[in-house]
Amino acid sequence: MDSSLGAIALGFVFGLQHATDADHVVAVASIVSRTGRFASGALVGAFWGLGHTVTIAAAGMAIVLFNVTVTPRAGLSMELAVALMLMALGVARILRLMREREEAPGQSVRGHGHDAPGFWLVLRTLGPAQAARSTLTGLVHGLAGSAAVALLVLSTVRSPYAAVAYLLVFGLGTIAGMTVITALLSVPFAARLPILFRFRRALALGTGLLSLGFGLYLAVHISFVDGLLLGR
């Protein structure tokens, strides 16, 4: 029992580490660059982590409890979906920047009054579209990583109940880790200094190009090096 509890607790640490995967950080960076508040940036990570946890837990439980098998080809297909999503996020960010006019600093963040306290004000500032985008991104990432996480669970704990607990604690770790990451990423976009306005736009463009380029690299690697489109 003690060893199982230790393994479950270790799942939180692995979840924190998992949040730092390059494709995860690149994806959320392009979303965070759309926000203009520190708290909103942190919420991007929280929603991403929520979506990631839902699919990791659901798919992981199916694998652990019902012996559902994920074939190598299916795993590569899910990873390709992540690559295409990264490309889409990058293109969307670049196109939005191209449409935006040069605005005076501070005009791009809309006020919402003071009728909603604390968390709800921050949530309204983030907006439903950004919350949905963050959650969907996490869902896709979680689906692609579910097989690997399930194998990690099977090699760590034996009891099915402990395995389920591990998946949930792992999910909490990814939520906590990504919330911290996106909060830090949001700092330059939340700064209100006029001198940083052009820098923020350049940084936002950089996140879009990075997401597009990294997604393209992954797509080519998965399709041809790993052999998804070659039938290997």
Residue ranges and their predicted role:
Residues 1-232:
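Membrane metalloprotein/metal-transporter helix-bundle signature
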